């Protein structure tokens, strides 16, 4: 086969593998338990959407990436972004260790020598997150993180509409080294100028400041949305 034919078949194979991974994840017993636990969580009144990324609920393939280029994907939702030329990073899916963890899996990011100026993990939200979304909605994020040592961590919601992207930034506070920190932050879409009729993409960035020689474990991450209360 010629090079062009090989490239086309490779693209088809990658798309097929992604579809098969999603199918296997949906049928995974742990993923089923994770979805049931998410449905049972008490969330604000009027919650009309809740979601946990697949890499928290079921096993993905491959399980990890070492020395990733910026923009490298892990699973079909997560990506790592950085400007570190040495790429001394490892991002991998791990099993959560505690029986009380709602998600059976998490992500672990190990950082060795880091000379870059930024490092983040991005999570793409599904298309369902945009159905009926308005500026009267609040998007709620709950995370559980374990940091090897203290560092500043930020959550940034990005809303792409037409040629524009609106950003909402929240700092995750009270992060201590060696301890699991449960965090809840809310993004009020009233503070954006998003065009509700031109929504194209929504994604979340977890941004790590000065991450050199450290590790971060993400043991929980889920999002939900509800309407702002009327006064």
Task: Enumerate the predicted regions with their spans.
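Extra-cytoplasmic beta-strand recognition segments
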Residues: 127-151
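Extended, low-complexity, turn-rich repeat/linker tracts enriched in Gly/Pro/Ser/Thr and Asp/Glu
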Residues: 144-153, 161-162, 210-213
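Extracellular glycan-recognition surfaces and repeat-rich motifs
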Residues: 81-105
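Secreted extracellular polysaccharide-interacting domains
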Residues: 112-132, 162-164
């Amino acid at each position: 086969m010629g090079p062009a034919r090989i490239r086309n078949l490779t693209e088809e194979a990658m798309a097929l593998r992604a579809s098969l991974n999603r199918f296997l994840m949906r049928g995974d017993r742990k993923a089923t338990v994770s979805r049931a636990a998410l449905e049972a969580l008490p969330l604000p009144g009027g919650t009309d959407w809740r979601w946990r990324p697949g890499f928290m609920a079921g096993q993905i393939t491959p399980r990890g990436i070492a020395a990733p280029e910026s923009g490298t994907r892990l699973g079909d939702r997560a990506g790592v972004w950085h400007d570190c030329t040495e790429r001394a990073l490892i991002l991998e899916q791990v099993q959560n260790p505690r029986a009380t963890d709602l998600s059976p899996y998490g992500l672990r990011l190990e950082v060795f020598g880091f000379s870059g100026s930024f490092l983040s993990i991005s999570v793409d939200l599904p298309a369902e997150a945009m159905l009926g979304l308005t500026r009267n909605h609040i998007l709620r994020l709950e995370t559980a993180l374990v940091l090897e040592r203290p560092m500043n961590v930020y959550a940034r919601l990005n809303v792409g509409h037409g040629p524009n992207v609106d950003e909402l930034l929240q700092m995750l506070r009270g992060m201590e080294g060696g301890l699991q920190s449960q965090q809840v932050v809310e993004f009020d879409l009233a503070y954006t100028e998003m065009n509700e009729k031109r929504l194209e993409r929504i994604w979340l960035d977890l941004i790590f400041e000065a991450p050199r020689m450290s590790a971060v474990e993400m043991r929980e991450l889920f999002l939900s949305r509800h309407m702002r209360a009327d006064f």
